[in-house]
UniProtKB/Swiss-Prot annotation:
Annotated EC: 2.7.7.93
Protein's name according to its UniProt entry: Phosphonoformate cytidylyltransferase
Domain of life: Bacteria
Reported phenotype of the disruption mutant: Deletion mutant is unable to produce PTT when grown in MYG broth supplemented with 0.5 mM phosphonoformate.
GO MF terms, alphabetically ordered: nucleotidyltransferase activity
Pathway: Secondary metabolite biosynthesis; bialaphos biosynthesis
Catalytic reactions on record: phosphonoformate + CTP = CMP-5'-phosphonoformate + diphosphate
One GO biological process term: antibiotic biosynthetic process
The entry's keywords: Antibiotic biosynthesis, Nucleotidyltransferase, Transferase
Amino acid sequence: MSAEQIAGTGVIHGRFQPLHLGHLEYLLAGAERCRTLVVGITNPDPWTTTEETTDPERGLPESNPCTFYERYLMVEGALTEAGVSHERLRIVPFPHSFPERLAHYAPADARYFVTVYDDWGDAKLDRFHALGLRTEVMWRRTDKPVSGGRVRRSIAEGQPWEHLVPPAVARVVKECGIDERIRA
């Protein structure tokens, strides 16, 4: 990628319930495209989580076992462990269920990086376009090799799961008792 194609500030977002290797691929692809990466954590609390018709399970309490702070630790740990310096990284709440609020959390003049796997990805892209945000679709795919649901199910069923997440995330899950919470 040439210097002219690198954004000054890029915004990328995810629920990270928990952050897995698919998320890490996405986050690192975003980091390659900008000098400063703003990572928005969606559904930051139960009061900024609404039902999404294109993905109804994403708002359920059992789909959101990790707090904002725990996910902050996951994002920070995974990205710095992968070589992204703290100086380039900003982590913010990102209540995309309320698009009119996003300008209060992330810069409107940044480039917003997205990936599209399904109707939910297209719905988010439409929301960003409606807000007049500059977007870049990094890829469109139909197959997700790993998902947060798969990680949560593996933990709940007592199956191996650490291979699905970066080492820093496995540490946060264990240290914060997220694995015990999911199994309860």
